[in-house]
Amino acid sequence: ALFGPKWDLNIPNPADREKMLRHQKKGMQISREFGCVTYTIHVGAYHYCYDRIPLETLRPLAHQALETLIPEAEKLGMIIAVENSFEMPNSAKEVIGLTDPFMSSPAIGLCYDTGHANCMASAPWKKMEEYAPYFPVCWWENGVIPEDGALEKMKDRIVTCHIHDNNGYADLHDMPGDGTIDWNALVPELKSCPNMKEYQTEVGLVGGRNWAGVSAAPAGGYSIRRLVDTFRKLGF
């Protein structure tokens, strides 16, 4: 879907909301013309993290947006997939709660993001002070709250997934195997999701430093060949 602060489900400005809804509908129409079945969208984090608008204000806005967009998705034969991320408004708990009232519709589901879930999962070796600088901003109320078992919680609603790796501290979008995710354990779990429609790579091919941190990619970035070979070895 269209991505960014102006296109999130929970944007508060009325004029921006009207534009967001209109363009998201158009985005679904174009995606369907290209044969897409799912349409992944973010609840939104910018206005919570940087404007510090509380969740109690933002949740109803996201709900209202889905009320408007789901009928369009039903008409097109598409599924809106709400994605888990590493900010409080996009946690697995929040996206499950947001989609709860709409689960009678065939046009709503979830997108499981492997890298986002890895950042939020606890681990014996993790240290809070090692998280990327933007994590405390994303969890400004009570600090970073780990969220374990996101896949299990979301599993029955997952219709698509974003596949990439990281070091557990930053949203680096590295190649599977270059981070801390246990792919031998994760892949069978992904494949057992009963409503999964597709698997998508979200590996960032360009190496070096970006907004999220320093990529694990080699100098010159990841090659398409390595990407294809890696995903084939994983069984995709």
Regions found by a protein language model. Name each.
Residues 1-5, 41-46, 164-166, 202-205:
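Short loop/turn segments at strand-loop or loop-helix junctions that form parts
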Residues 2, 6-9, 175, 180:
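Residue-level preference for alpha-helix termini and adjacent loops
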Residues 4-112, 119:
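Active-site acidic/histidine proton-transfer and metal-coordination neighborhood
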Residues 25-29, 35-37, 60-63, 89-236:
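Histidine-acidic metal/acid-base catalytic patches
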